Amino acid sequence: MTPTLAQRHLTHPGTSTPRATDAQLRARDWAEIQERMLVPLYDAVHERLEVGAGTRLLGLGCGSGLALLMAATRGASVTGVEHLCPERLALARERLLPDGLWGDHAADARLMEGGPEAAVDVSRPPYNMITAFQPIGCMSGDSEGLAPLLQRAAPLADRGSLVVLAGWGPPERCTTSSVLRVATRLADPLRSTGSWRPSERDDLEDVAQRAGLKPDGSGRVACPFGYADMDSAVRGLLSTGLFDAAVGATDARQVRKELTEALHPHLRRDGTVWMANVFRYLVARTR
């Protein structure tokens, strides 16, 4: 699965779909370049929590659905909701639904646009696992909406169900942190949200506490960001949305130029770009 995703991004997604919007192209870059960098995180969580045939999983902010696909291949029944990026959700449908371009990977998969309420189905048993894999802890305010989202999702699960949150590791363990500072430098310095900030030790625990969840373990996973070339690295990082404020404050060309310069120290002699990173995850339970 991962090698297929790695190879697909070598041709720019815009070449086969000239009418695609910028949002669609960025979503495609996310799905084909950037999202696979988090595969070690998804794998570690699924392995530790023994995701399988008995798992009824609700993915919050499921994006283009790679984590759901990986859970489904382990036998889980998966449901994903996405309220921020319909373009990514469209790609998740390609991956997961029977009539999608990727084939029938998961017969028991549901995908909806919206928040947790969109996942309500009284004909099905409650969920026993909730995931929020979009990492927090690198931009000011990036966790503000997560606790309320988890509060709304918790009633859809059995009492004591597993909940997984993800975040960036310590800045000194995340090489990409230095690159993300470009976004802050180019964006409006007066912005209170959307600027880079170092992750803090208890970011995930604080969110869990605000959401009324009971922490039940944590872990760290190495998630290196490796790209075939500089163009892929720039496109992949831009697809995260972390540079949107910088693009709005300046322009896309300037951001690409500054980002390329920031990535240059991580360019290898063979043309690949490599940055070591560590991500955290917190396992909690509903009360």
Q: Where are these predicted regions, by residue range?
A:
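Conserved class I S-adenosyl-L-methionine
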Residues: 2-55, 85-88, 98-99, 105
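Conserved Class I S-adenosyl-L-methionine
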Residues: 3-5, 23, 27, 38, ...
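Class I SAM-dependent methyltransferase SAM/SAH-binding core
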Residues: 58, 64-120
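Class I S-adenosylmethionine-dependent transferase superfamily signal
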Residues: 71, 152-153
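A short acidic, Gly/Pro-enriched loop at the edge of an enzyme's catalytic core
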Residues: 117-130
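Residues lining the SAM
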Residues: 132-136, 166
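A short, conserved alpha-helix within the catalytic core of class I
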Residues: 138-152
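Conserved catalytic/acceptor-binding region of the Class I
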Residues: 154, 160-226, 244
